[in-house]
């Protein structure tokens, strides 16, 4: 039986730009803080490690190359000791971790999410199915075996999506069909509406993401919805601006956009613009019942005889090999990355390399 009542944490903080080691340690520090606070779940923003490359929206390809090189060098491989350290932190704190990160696999980057369980097991590994607009200059597409989201856990049926995936009606339909109860709507760093210039659509700033898309997801699916967001400082603006370009001086428009919503879309909490740390929420899964009793789009309020969604979870390979029986040999991304192997079987347990540094928190 899943727990029906527990505490969860939602991260709203500035990433460690272009610094994999510092980003891993800051992640572990937040996991430790959430664990010490009695949380059963902590949710991180989209590509929290090593930060969202928002510079790609503001400069041209040639200007971006030095930062792109550094970004790739500081992205996180899943079969690395850095990732195993994060898994150990989840195990040490007996906590579920929804981690957004720039995953490097061979020579391609992916907007990845991993759901790590309290034993350190990687329960779900997914990649954003389609990078948004200029994100295609940095990241590749997810595959059939890396896009499903909802997983049965002792905390209930938990799902996670990245950024504009949270307004994709087909992904929402897939998640709701699997009985999702808790949702991580992970967002990157985004400017606010005061920066909007016609004819750029309002969709392209943070306010609709926080105050329209995310509560709509909660209402349409009847889920507790946590929306972790990244932040920016003056120093962060300098680090994410290429040489020869004058950096912005006021980071406030990028901050204060994290949210937590109940299954009926009611706002639970949001941070002040100057807050950097963890938002806490007491989740009660029983509150999903009445929301879903009104509108359950996977059950009484849907007509699958009229409307159905085709889902293909097969991985399509560029090269396939024949197996010994004359068929086609297949494998999953999960198997290739060794995520099906228990944590202690992959590498000997090592101590963390930096001391725990507490972070700010808010209820």
From Swiss-Prot:
EC assignment: 4.2.1.66
Q: Report the gene name.
A: CyhAB
What's one Pfam family the UniProt record gives for this protein? CN_hydrolase
Alphabetical UniProt keywords: Hydrolase, Lyase
Q: Which GO terms describe its biological process?
A: cyanide catabolic process
Q: Decide whether keyword Hydrolase is in the record.
A: yes
Q: Does the keyword field hold Hydrolase?
A: yes
Catalytic activity field:
formamide = hydrogen cyanide + H2O
What job does the chain carry out? Catalyzes the hydration of cyanide to formamide. Degradation of cyanide may be important for plant pathogenic fungi in infection of cyanogenic plants.
The UniProt similarity line reads: Belongs to the carbon-nitrogen hydrolase superfamily. Nitrilase family.
Provide the GO MF annotations for this entry: cyanide hydratase activity; nitrilase activity
> Subunit structure, per the record?
Oligomer of dimers, forming left-handed helical fibers.
Inducing factors: By cyanide. Expressed on the host leaf surface in late stages of fungal infection.
> In the UniProt entry, which residues are flagged as the active site?
46, 128, 163
The protein here is known as: Cyanide hydratase
